[in-house]
A protein has these predicted regions:
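Conserved post-Walker A/P-loop segment of ABC ATPase nucleotide-binding domains
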Residues: 55-64, 121
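The feature captures the beta-strand-to-loop junction immediately N-terminal to the Walker
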Residues: 37-39
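Conserved ABC ATPase "signature" region
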Residues: 67-76, 123-142
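Short coil-to-helix segment of the ABC ATPase nucleotide-binding domain corresponding to the Q-loop/switch region
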Residues: 105-114, 146
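Helix-to-loop junction immediately C-terminal to a conserved catalytic motif
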Residues: 52
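ABC ATPase NBD Q-loop/coupling interface
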Residues: 61-87
């Protein structure tokens, strides 16, 4: 089963003068490990940002399993509704090469804040999920620590 499918993705910057992604297609199957390799400025991060719904594509299709998050219509990407995108964001994320934690937030707050702001979860649900993840990683004793 395809977990991620991107078809004919296009992305430009600077009023369409800088074409970063030109007709890029890829799929990721369940259990598959994929590496995106290329020189600096080749569009790797832009592609991942489009896949994670952090940057809008100019054109193309985007599927997460059987959920269509974006479709191509008249040469432009048209995104699904808010609720559909919210479901997708719950299942897909990425960690940047130089990610940053908020040094003035505890470990627990660093884990709960994105869930509340991005996923719209209530504080109690976000904290419960964060504690599950900390326990899974053997870091339960660090929830009150600061980075």
């Amino acid at each position: 089963m395809k977990l991620l499918q991107m078809n004919h993705v296009q992305k430009s910057f600077n009023d369409d003068t800088l074409h970063v992604l030109k007709d890029i297609s890829l799929s990721v199957e369940k259990g598959e490990v994929v590496a995106i390799i290329g020189p600096s400025g080749s569009g790797k991060s832009t592609l991942l940002r489009c896949a994670a719904l952090l940057t809008d594509m100019d054109d193309g299709e985007l599927f997460y399993g059987d959920i269509q998050a974006a479709r191509s219509e008249n040469g432009r990407a048209v995104y699904a509704g808010k609720e559909t995108l919210k479901r997708v964001r719950e299942k897909f994320g990425l960690v940047f090469q130089s990610f940053n934690l908020f040094p003035h937030y505890s470990v627990l707050k660093n884990l709960t804040d994105p869930q509340i702001r991005v996923l719209g979860r209530d504080k109690e649900t976000a904290q419960q999920r964060a504690r599950q993840l900390l326990e899974k990683m053997g870091l339960s004793d660090k929830e009150g620590a600061y980075p």
